[in-house]
């Protein structure tokens, strides 16, 4: 995983720790739209998947991309917990929250997502913001698919996300590796 990303020609550095495909995802504490702490769990009793997506902010070109992703996931017919994560100082939360159908908007006020998933930017004009990232966590709590563009202006590959969602859903048997 690269430790640098680019946004509008500026090189930005990511924190050193990161989580990769195949690793067990981490539970993280965030703040919901009511200002209450909430734990995002890596796995759920109903065996649903989890999708964690972060952006540095919800302005400019990012809002259009956020709405496209939300529209795609709104039409997915399997249970999936979807979280749109921004840093703790994000102020446009209610504007975005009111436009989303599938995602719950949360803030990384405890700095757990940024630090544990390696999405925290530690230099440049977006210092202490979250980089653009997408983590698909399978039903068993492992990171199944990860996309973290090295150029923040590059959009997520939604066709690939659709394929990975299907693979993650179909590949889980519920019996473990010794079953």
Located regions from the model:
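Chalcogenol-based redox active-site neighborhoods
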Residues: 1-179
